[in-house]
């Protein structure tokens, strides 16, 4: 059977990824460009603290951030984090994997649409993000600007309980 051109996307837990890979990923200036809260340098200690904090979200909320693999290779991290009463979705890809954003997002949103705790997700994007067409095509709507840790973000909301056409169940 011929294989499609899209890689096989897997979601694994962050502790499954070597800390050195996380440090290299988060130290890439192309990644840092759109992360205004990333004002510090990453090293092994910072990566270990990051993984521990994200795992604490899993313990507290039963959901959190994953590491993403494409054909078994680490390509980034992201997922859902509870912010007050809302579930925020974040995605931080390695520059070589920027084209995998939609397949990964669709797979995550299909997961969210099956979870009754998540009637909608929010997306917080820095104003430096200009290409927002994919977000709009998914059905996300702009709900305003918000301040997070003293930094301005654009906030979008996407209903996860809507028609299946809005959120594809395949990656």
Short names for language-model regions:
Residues 32-52:
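Conserved GNAT-fold acetyl-CoA-binding loop/helix
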Residues 1-33, 65-171:
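Acyl-donor (CoA/ACP) binding surface of acyl/acetyltransferases
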Residues 40, 60-63, 121:
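Secondary-structure boundary/capping residues
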Residues 52-66:
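A short helix-loop-beta-strand connector motif used in the catalytic cores of GNAT acetyltransferases and
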Residues 22-27, 47-54:
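Hydrophobic alpha-helical core bundles mediating ligand binding, dimerization, or RNAP-core interactions
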